[in-house]
Design a protein with these regions (language model features):
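N-terminal Sec-pathway targeting helices
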Residues: 1-13
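Hydrophobic alpha-helical membrane-insertion segments, chiefly the h-region
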Residues: 13-24
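Conserved active-site-adjacent core of cysteine acyl-enzyme catalytic domains
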Residues: 23-62, 66-73, 109-207
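A short glycine/serine-rich beta->alpha loop
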Residues: 74-84, 116-117
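Active-site nucleophilic cysteine motif
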Residues: 82-98, 120-132
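Active-site catalytic microenvironments for nucleophilic, acid-base chemistry
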Residues: 95-100, 185-188
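Short, solvent-exposed loop/turn elements at domain surfaces
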Residues: 97-98, 105, 207
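Short, well-structured active-site flanking segments
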Residues: 101-111
Length: 207
């Protein structure tokens, strides 16, 4: 049986670099015009290091993907769509529970009640901690554990936990906040990090 290990973290900003040409053409969110301002942050990589025929602009079968020399991914991780606008946290937790147990222990609204999820602000990290404490699982969280504070340490953190078969539940606080599960990381086989890819199980992904 798989060891029940889980990581909970608040990630204020997760920047998935690479494929920015695609974003410029497809994203409804303005991300700036190259050359209009000095390049800073992710903007400095616009058009650089794009991977020709990248599999991530197709529809990869993440469920059946296998790790290789540059991809680390949790196999057979099933995604779940959240049933309300505010239960991304409970849905993310249930995805992880199902990954380990083959089924959920509580329905999404029951998990939301245990977490103290709110229709106005959703679920905070303490709520996540409350649920996994209730079901008796071993886990780490940003409430009590050290979390990476730079890109290089973050990559090590992600790779080491995925190789240890440990999903990472993360929340970004931009645009109202949203919980997802990191299930994979791909270096794309290059030394630079501007084309790296994080693979997330997103309970609000309707594609």
């Amino acid at each position: 049986m798989k060891t029940k290990r889980i990581l909970l973290a608040i990630v204020c900003l997760i920047v998935i670099l690479g494929g920015l040409n695609y974003l410029l053409q497809q994203s409804p969110m303005p991300i700036g015009t190259p050359g209009s301002t000095p390049a800073d942050g992710a903007a400095q990589f616009v058009g650089k290091h794009d991977i020709k025929d990248s599999p991530y602009f197709k529809h990869p079968d993440f469920y059946n993907m296998q790790s290789d020399e540059h991809l680390t991914i949790l196999p057979k991780f099933a995604t779940t769509q959240q049933i309300t606008h505010y239960t991304c946290g409970p849905a993310a937790a249930n995805m992880v529970v199902k990954y380990y147990k083959g089924k959920t222990l509580d329905d999404e609204l029951a998990v939301a009640k245990i977490m103290g999820s709110s229709k106005t602000v959703g679920t905070n990290t303490k709520g996540m901690v409350n649920y996994f404490e209730k079901i008796g699982w071993e886990f780490h969280s940003s409430i009590k554990d050290k979390t990476p504070d730079n890109y290089k340490d973050f990559l090590k953190f992600v790779e080491s936990n995925l190789k240890n078969n440990t999903p990472i539940i993360v929340e970004n606080v931009d645009w109202g906040g949203h919980w997802r599960v990191i299930i994979g990381y791909d270096s794309m086989g290059t030394a630079h990090q501007s084309d790296d890819v994080l693979i997330m199980a997103d309970p609000y992904d309707t594609t």
